[in-house]
Every structure is written in C-alpha cells, then in structure tokens.
C-alpha cells in the first residue's frame, strides 16, 4: 500500500544507506488523530467518534551505517487481525484495540520479510532501537530474539498505553539512560562512536517517547515516531487525542521546530503518508 524508499547519503564521505519500509497500514478514529480537546476529554471525544481516518503507513527505518546496522522500531505483524489477539491484555484493551483502530498487514509486509528483500540478514543487525513501547512499534520483535534491543529506561519504567502481554517471552531489552545533551534536546544517548546518530527524548505521546536523529552530510534525518501523525500537524500546532501529557507534547513540538530552523532536517513521523517522498527528495521541514 505504501512503497518503501531507499536513499544513499554520506557522513564524511562514507555511505549511509537509509531504508524506510511500511509494515502494513493502520487507520484510527478521526478524533484520535486530530483532537480538538486534551486529556480525558480528548479520549472521550475520539471513543464516541464513529468515523475513521484514511489508511496510514506504519514506517520502520533501517540504517546501514559505518558503525553498524540499525533497525528503528519493528512495526506491526499480520497476526494483529486474528480473533482474540488482544484478549490476553484484558477486557478494556481488547475492546479498545479492536474498536479504535483498523489494521491491514500482509505477511510479506512484516519487518522480517522486508529485511530479506533488502538483502539484510537479521544476524548482521547491530541493534534494534524502540522509540516507545506501543503495539505498532514492537509487534515485529519476534524476528529479533538474539539482537540487542535498546529502550529508553524512562519509557520502560513509566510506560503509557503499552501491552506487555504481547511482548515475546524472551524480551529483556537493554535499558539506556539518556543522560547527555544534544543541541536543544536535554536528554540524549549517542548510538554511534562518532555521535552522528543519536536517540533523543521527545515526550508527549508517552512519557519516555524518543526519536532518532541521523546526522549526514546532505541532511539530518529525524525519525520522529509518534511525536505527531504528520509534519502538517507539527507545523500547524495540531495534536492527537492520546498524548500522555499535552504540555510535554507542546514542548516537544517547540524543540523540534527550534532544532529544524536554519538547517536541512527531514522529518519522518511513523504514520505520515508523505514521509517517504520527503525522504526520497530530501525535502526539509523549513
């Protein structure tokens, strides 16, 4: 439904290949994506909404970097539409996740087959980086039982909206503390020795939500995960209806815009239909 995009960029003249693949598609209640209220009122508003958005991608980013092979988020899997998939998570979660979302995921769209198409062996992957612990970002973990998986410790300690019953039984991620600073971002963890790939805390959607920034010669690639549903939301100060804390989301918006002004930043939210084209054309926020 959403074709993948691959670009070859550089860092100090060395190639950095970036692949963006969609592990199926999702649609949500319209007021889930585009809220007119905040907090509990936003939740009530979207639960009463009877209309869904159009189909949106579930992007996963794969980075072939001189320091290693990195997978950012793992996307969704085809079992999500199986009857009873959410029952282990309790009555409310089962009701919520079967009435507020719709998924369309084929087996070949899962992250494992997508990596195979790219000629990437799972055993060669250096790390999987999870931006946060929501379903459509962790549901491809089954392909990575022997891979180092990085999670922000704060996201792990104070989750929001996660479904741990759906984690693989072996899932014990490496918890990282974001105790450094990167430009406007107060909390950061460097993923490469040259500090050209960095995990930054971008809270709002969850308390410990993170994004990944890749600093290349041509541009900075900003994998934003669920900061917002689209670049348009960011630019027009519109918010989703499911933020853990609205004030945190507002602050993150301000930081992203401050970071992006005066430089070439390619902004890639996980569910933005136009993100692939922006990556292909290296179209910046400003």
Task: Give a label for each model feature.
Residues 138-146:
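Conserved nucleotide-sugar donor-interacting segment of glycosyltransferase catalytic cores
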Residues 178, 183-239:
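Glycine/small-residue-rich hydrophobic helix-like segments
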Residues 23-24, 74-77, 133, 155, ...:
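Active-site metal-binding loops of divalent metal-dependent hydrolases
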Residues 5-16, 35-38, 150-151, 156-171, ...:
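C-terminal/domain-terminus segments
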Residues 1-120, 124-136, 143, 219-225, 261, ...:
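Metallo-beta-lactamase
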Residues 78, 83, 93-111, 217-286:
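Cap/insert and terminal regions of metallo-dependent hydrolase folds
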